[in-house]
């Protein structure tokens, strides 16, 4: 049936990559909180001429970099989740699975030319009579 799992790829490295991406995102979010607080403090201090305009501008620029790091971290988490989802190889159509070309525990690569198996669609069946 369509959506039925045909193969399972070891998810361990993909889980590790997802956990790493989540940790990087958490670090970036914590840094952004710190930078937001620093900019808020400097905004008051620059108005009172207690801190230089250059220091304030640097803090604002660093805040922008921290926000970009958070966005990049979110994208990395999304990518890791997508890659983890690819560890379940499912049938795209309903049909019969042909002979499997790989055995359990075999090493396969994303770029290999050999098919792992073929799914043959049985419904509808078209016949050409001549």
Segments (PLM) and residue ranges:
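Amphipathic alpha-helical coiled-coil/rod segments that serve as protein-protein coupling scaffolds
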Residues: 1-111, 124-128
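Short beta-alpha junctions and helix-cap segments that line functional grooves
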Residues: 112-116
């Amino acid at each position: 049936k369509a959506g039925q799992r045909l193969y399972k790829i070891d998810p361990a490295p993909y889980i590790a990559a997802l956990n790493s991406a989540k940790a990087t995102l958490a670090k970036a979010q914590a840094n952004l909180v710190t930078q937001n607080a620093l900019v808020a403090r400097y905004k008051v201090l620059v108005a009172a001429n207690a801190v230089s305009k250059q220091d304030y501008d640097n803090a604002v620029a660093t805040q922008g970099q921290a926000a970009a790091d958070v966005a990049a971290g979110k994208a990395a988490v999304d990518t890791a989740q997508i890659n983890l989802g690819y560890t379940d190889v499912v049938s795209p159509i309903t049909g019969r699975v042909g002979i499997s070309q790989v055995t359990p525990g075999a090493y396969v690569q994303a770029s290999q030319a050999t098919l792992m198996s073929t799914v043959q669609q049985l419904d509808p069946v078209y016949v050409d009579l001549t």
